[in-house]
């Protein structure tokens, strides 16, 4: 199978709702698609020792992360009959309530779109060198674990 074009995954700050909506809208003309599956990772306002998380500040080893994102994409295209796939992950500060991860898969049939999306999200969380520092309301921070 031919390798797919390498895609830019990282965005500075939150993934906007408008970006997600525009991504969905662009696929309405692709009539060979029968199903989409979307995962949106949102920053929670968790409580840590009596203080609330205000944001997560994401950092990454970008070169390694981009290589791993590409490998995950290639593996998913090889395993599932996907028409399209998009992955976008935040770098920098993302406030509680905002989106930090957007995974969007499309296929002629729902099972492939759903299974691929789920597998991609799990692999990102387990394999990609991205770290989140939870910034608390008093300015202190806690390193997040997946």
Predicted regions and their residues:
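N-terminal, polar/charged subdomain of small-to-medium soluble alpha/beta proteins
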Residues: 1-99, 108, 112-118, 122-146
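Short hydrophobic/aromatic beta-strand micro-patches
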Residues: 104-106
